[in-house]
Regions:
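Repeated loop/turn-to-beta-strand initiation elements of outer-membrane beta-barrel proteins
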Residues: 27-32, 136-139, 204-207, 268-271, ...
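Transmembrane beta-strands of outer-membrane beta-barrel pores
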Residues: 2-4, 25-27, 36-40, 145-149, ...
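Residues on the lipid-exposed face of transmembrane beta-strands in outer-membrane beta-barrel proteins
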Residues: 19-23, 125-131, 141, 194-200, ...
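Transmembrane beta-barrel wall of Gram-negative outer-membrane proteins
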Residues: 1-3, 8-44, 53-55, 59-85, ...
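Membrane-embedded beta-strand positions of outer-membrane beta-barrel proteins
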Residues: 1, 21, 32-34, 141-143, ...
Length: 336
């Protein structure tokens, strides 16, 4: 699918696909599914901006979206373009028709900034099986793997160098505070796991046991792809090499196993019990996209991430139940 977008610079396209195979006989069924999707969408997440960091259009009578539409800003997108601002009068100029003036963001070579885009791709693979070797036993199992990758890329007009951990100077060694940037922030992820359970039923027993093993790995990253040189800097000091200004990895392991059983004492009385064990581990390390100030070069340092936590849970439960002619009562004890 595709769209031209209503706001300036918000054209986009997306798509998805699906495929699957199934094989079965009287006792065994095997399935495989592949599901994927992608999107590249122009963004306008700043909303309807009524001004800039220096002044507000509200000072010039713009208070509603209808006001903005009437003055030529109905499709204005601050991620795509800027408002002309007169620093002397602290006002936004208007043309003879009363429309506010806008300008497109430009690179140093004169080319126009195309648009801010969000880009993402994801693919899911799922294989499952059900096996019924007898009237008493049923086995279910599934494995899965999902890969995802995405990023957004945006123009950052008149941003501070310190926002990206940079200390910039000109030819006289004077500090330069601001410039135009293009930043790219994104992630990649791998998720995979296994699920299995077995069920046994006869005249007296109903038993179920299962296993769940899940693992997630993710990476967050950020790059500075462009810095305008129009501000005249000749040197930049920063705490990282190249144009990657942060990078962090994270993982989650989630493992659990359970067993439950119900025994029919009589036609009206049952006893039941179950127990679950769960283990969860979180880990993340690397560099955050926030910076702290230093008294000497490189003048800034990335915030460090260092989390490594594990948790274990054991949850038992037991009880007795009574049921007759549509009525049911039970008593149970559990530990959570």
């Amino acid at each position: 699918t595709g769209t031209n977008g209503f706001r300036h610079g918000t054209a986009g396209r997306s798509g998805s696909y699906y495929g699957g195979l199934t094989w079965f006989n009287n006792k065994l069924q095997i399935k495989y599914k592949n599901i994927g999707n992608f999107e590249k969408t122009g963004q306008a997440w700043n909303g309807i901006v009524a001004g800039n960091s220096d002044a507000s259009l509200m000072d010039q009578g713009i208070k509603t979206y209808q006001d903005m539409w009437n003055h030529g800003l109905g499709r204005f997108n601050s991620l795509y373009e800027g408002l002309v601002f007169d620093k002397a009068s602290k006002k936004f100029p208007q043309d003879a028709s009363g429309n506010f003036q806008t300008f497109r963001y430009r690179m140093d070579d004169g080319s126009l900034w195309n648009r801010t885009t969000d880009n993402f791709y994801q693919n899911h693979n799922i294989a499952s099986m059900q096996w019924r070797p007898s009237n008493h036993w049923t086995h279910n199992a599934a494995i899965h793997y999902t890969y995802g990758y995405g990023y957004y890329k945006e123009f950052r007009p008149n941003n501070k160098f310190e926002k990206f951990g940079m200390y910039a100077t000109d030819a006289t060694n004077s500090k330069i505070k601001r410039s135009d940037f293009i930043r790219r922030k994104g992630l990649s992820q791998h998720t995979y796991g296994l699920l299995y359970n077995a069920n046994y039923i006869n005249e007296k027993w109903d038993m179920l046991a299962g296993l769940n093993l899940q693992h997630f790995n993710g990476n967050h990253f950020g790059y500075i792809d462009y810095i305008s040189k129009r501000v005249g800097f000749v040197n930049i000091v920063k705490p990282y090499d190249g144009n990657q200004y942060y990078d962090s990895d994270a993982s989650k392991r989630d493992y659990s196993a359970f067993g439950k059983a119900l025994y029919h004492i009589t036609q009206q009385w049952d006893v039941f019990g179950d127990v679950q064990y769960r283990f969860v581990a979180y880990k993340t390390d690397g560099l955050n996209d926030k910076f702290i100030s230093l008294s000497s070069a490189p003048y800034y340092a990335n915030q460090q991430l260092n989390i490594n936590e594990t948790y274990s849970f054991l949850n038992p439960k037991a009880g007795i139940s009574f049921h007759k002619e549509g009525h049911k009562a039970y008593f149970s004890v559990a530990l959570a």
